A protein has these predicted regions:
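A short, surface-exposed alpha-helical micro-motif characterized by mixed small hydrophobic
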Residues: 236-238
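Conserved ABC ATPase "signature" region
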Residues: 26-28, 146-164
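Helix-to-loop junction immediately C-terminal to a conserved catalytic motif
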Residues: 74
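Conserved ABC ATPase signature
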Residues: 169-173, 177
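ABC ATPase NBD Q-loop/coupling interface
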Residues: 83-106
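ABC ATPase "signature
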Residues: 254-255
Length: 278
């Protein structure tokens, strides 16, 4: 099976950069800072594949670079090096970092969906939940309003939102309901890839479990590829067949999730595993 998405040698630097941190083998010091110029090395030399229908997990502590990688894939974070190859454009396999503005919008609005930990990043709080999801179809040039409304309502039912709450504004939803609306918005245009950036962070444990169950059932039902970012390695274990462990902007370990968690080779991975068990 050919990859849906291939990330090669991805690099993101915050700051002016220098020959050292912009080179092929930067040496970040404490807090991911370049010891020469002080720029932040958010991620460097990040390489991995995502296959159709799989759920890939990226785990690491705050500042490890995992959310930066998602932003680069979603084309909302400019990169300093590398390539991201995507196979589902009509023109064939393309490096999406080099596409024009129109193709970029097509990727963001149709091919990819994203769910943020902070719902304010994913939802417009000045329009209804129904409007948030319908708006994404309008951006994708859907103009049959009756069909849009029917599809939105069907999807809301799929993510277990009561029809009585369709027209409520996001501010009036609970945290779990806000995440359900984000999930509906991410799915509405039948994307090939869903990006999940700590989607259960900050939620009560019982609500977290329900959202994770929803994500797992959607993955199985729709066979859509997902990249799940989390600091909680047990959340990754629940959803993901393969895992990437990041530290200081680099991938330090990867493989089948059960293998990595049951027999971690790196001390940092061992710490992540033990911290969630305790």
């Amino acid at each position: 099976m050919n990859p849906l998405l291939s990330v090669h040698n991805l690099k993101k630097i915050y700051g002016e950069g220098c020959d050292d941190c912009m080179g092929p083998s930067p040496r970040p010091g404490p807090d991911n800072l370049c010891p020469i110029c002080g720029s932040i090395i958010a991620c460097t030399d990040v390489t991995f594949d995502v296959y159709p229908g799989e759920v890939l997990g990226i785990v690491g502590e705050s500042g490890s670079g995992k959310s930066t990688v998602l932003g680069c894939i979603n084309l909302t974070t400019p990169v300093n090096g590398g390539e991201i190859l995507y196979s589902r454009l009509q023109s064939g396999i393309r490096n999406i970092l080099e596409v024009d503005a129109q193709t970029r919008r097509t990727l963001q609005n149709i091919h990819f969906g994203i769910v943020y930990q902070n719902p304010h990043l994913g939802l417009n709080f000045s329009i209804s939940g129904e409007g948030n999801v319908a708006e994404r179809m309008l951006v994708a040039d859907s103009r049959n309003f009756a069909a849009i409304q029917e599809k939105v309502h069907n999807l809301f039912e799929r993510v277990e939102l009561s029809s009585a709450r369709f027209k409520d504004y996001p501010i009036n939803y609970s945290g779990g309901m806000q995440q359900r609306v984000q999930i509906a918005k991410a799915l509405i245009n039948a994307p090939s890839l869903i990006l999940l950036d700590e989607p259960t962070g900050g939620l009560d444990v019982s609500v977290q479990a329900k959202i994770l169950d929803l994500i797992r059932s959607i993955s199985r039902e729709l066979n859509v590829a997902m990249i799940m970012v989390s600091h909680d390695i047990q959340v990754i274990r629940l959803l993901c067949k393969r895992i990437i462990v990041m530290k200081h902007g680099r991938i330090i370990e990867s493989g089948l999730t059960d293998r990595v968690i049951d027999d971690p080779q790196q001390a940092y991975t061992q710490t992540l595993v033990h911290s969630t068990i305790q």
